[in-house]
Amino acid sequence: MAFTKISLVLLLCLLGFFSETVKSQNCGCAPNLCCSQFGYCGTDDAYCGVGCRSGPCRGSGTPTGGSVGSIVTQGFFNNIINQAGNGCAGKRFYTRDSFVNAANTFPNFANSVTRREIATMFAHFTHETGHFCYIEEINGATRNYCQSSNTQYPCAPGKGYFGRGPIQLSWNYNYGACGQSLGLDLLRQPELVGSNPTVAFRTGLWFWMNSVRPVLNQGFGATIRAINGMECNGGNSGAVNARIGYYRDYCGQLGVDPGPNLSC
């Protein structure tokens, strides 16, 4: 009988220990351990890879931090746009709410975005728009972005397909494909991108999901190549370094490691 009581006490102690262990795993990991998407601590790809919540995450596996709106706070957004001059048209155009509203129309993005991805995205937004100063490409209207050989998305007479929005959407084939995806006639009305902030952010997100997100796991440098490959391999080292600088800054603000392969 005494043996049975002792065994029972030991069993209860063990259960208590494992209960506390599980609590710590969901997710109070030591600083050198990753918290996996399922709430457990470890160091290999199962913990530090896709879905990683905290710790030294790798690739796209960075802390989610919750919804898009909880990551892109008003303070985070203001820290960027407040660096634009008072005379900037974009300062009266781009808003944090228009970004969040646009992001929520892309559930695959909104439901899986990570802090590192937000840092990546806003580093490029910052570079492309001058801290959200510019809505349209400087002198863009004087440039020809019509690829006449593209018969799937033919250019409309008198319309310009120069860079607009946070990712500076350019060329008729991008306006056409993007508009088709979003249910908008951007071939005939490309100016919508420069007149409606939610549409502007939606075009940026469309380009992101199709051309940038697929290479996120390769590091920040691969995203530079996806957006403007002409800057890579010494094409424009100043621009590359500027993008990396913004990225490092935003990773710091959001509390995530920038990861490897930052340059291109």
From Swiss-Prot:
Coiled coil: none annotated. Disulfide bonds join C27-C35, C29-C41, C34-C48, C52-C57. SMART domains: ChtBD1 (SM00270). GO terms for cellular component: secretory vesicle. One of its GO terms (biological process) is defense response. The keyword Hydrolase applies. Belongs to the glycosyl hydrolase 19 family. Chitinase class I subfamily. This is Endochitinase At2g43590. It comes from Arabidopsis thaliana.
